[in-house]
Amino acid sequence: MNIVIKKEDVIDIVSRSVAILNRQLQQQQQPQLLGIDEFTRHFAEIDWTNVWSVITTASERYMTSLSEGEGSITLTLSMPPRYTLEQAPLQQTYKNVSAWTIMSLYAEKNAAPANVLQVISQQANVYLTLLRESLAGHRSAPIRKEPQKVRNIDKINWL
């Protein structure tokens, strides 16, 4: 299964996410993440090495190869054929992880206020967890456990 992550798609997610984040912070009258317009104009300067590092670390168990093209990265994951239908949501999760990783790096580099760093960090972790769970779900069907035998039927709290 090939997962293609295009930088332009990731930047689009970053732009929209930052706009939403700033609106929420503005409503709460809290400091915002500034300088995003300049950031999106100069996204070529972003050090993508860290972004790919986060992604590949999350995927290393399933990744068979990685190739960096012009403005994109292609991950080849070893997944059974029956999961190819789930490729689109998985691809979107990768883009979200990339976007929120960039936002984390950008916020840290530009000494964003603590409240902004916290929100970004939480959101980045949500997507990273989602990615790990998505990949783990591809491993195999869940192991069926035998139902536990009830030892003392009188002690069951029947509601």
Locations of regions flagged by a protein language model:
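Conserved aromatic-histidine-acidic binding/catalytic patches
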Residues: 43, 86-94, 112, 119
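Charged, low-complexity interaction regions
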Residues: 28-34, 109-117
